[in-house]
Amino acid sequence: MYRIPRRMIEQTFATFRSCGGNQRECQLYWLSPWDNPLVLTEVVHPKHWSSRYGLRIESDWINQFWNDLAERGLGVRIQVHTHPSEAFHSATDDAYPLLFDAGFLSLVIPDFAMGPVGFCNAYLTEIQPDGSWQQVAIAERIIVDE
């Protein structure tokens, strides 16, 4: 079970609101060190293009990001992005996660993150060993530390 400080959730929502402006999707990554992978420590906002109905991460940014993660001993644990209304995992979300590893989590925040800070009406899904996605309860995967 991942542990995340409340400040990271607040930072996530602030970034979503600033980037998306209640008009566009936005995506972030939650990181943790390899020597303590269950304690999330950092939010990363990738360079991306976005619209109301999708986004694309810049490939040059991703290449540099992998190098930075290796140098700093960090790994991506959860990708987090917004949707314009209801939170769900679209076919595009299923097909293009940052990682395709079993157990990788994708969290979708509804309403471009303009609602209350937290996981109300959010959707969490996890890659299964066969490559499919399965919705999982947020409380079974993430603990918020006040």
Predicted regions span which residues?
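Short, well-ordered beta-to-alpha junction loops that form the rim of enzyme active sites
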Residues: 82
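Conserved beta-strand-loop surface patch within small alpha/beta domains used
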Residues: 1-76, 85-146
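Phosphate-binding glycine-rich loops of NTP-binding sites
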Residues: 79
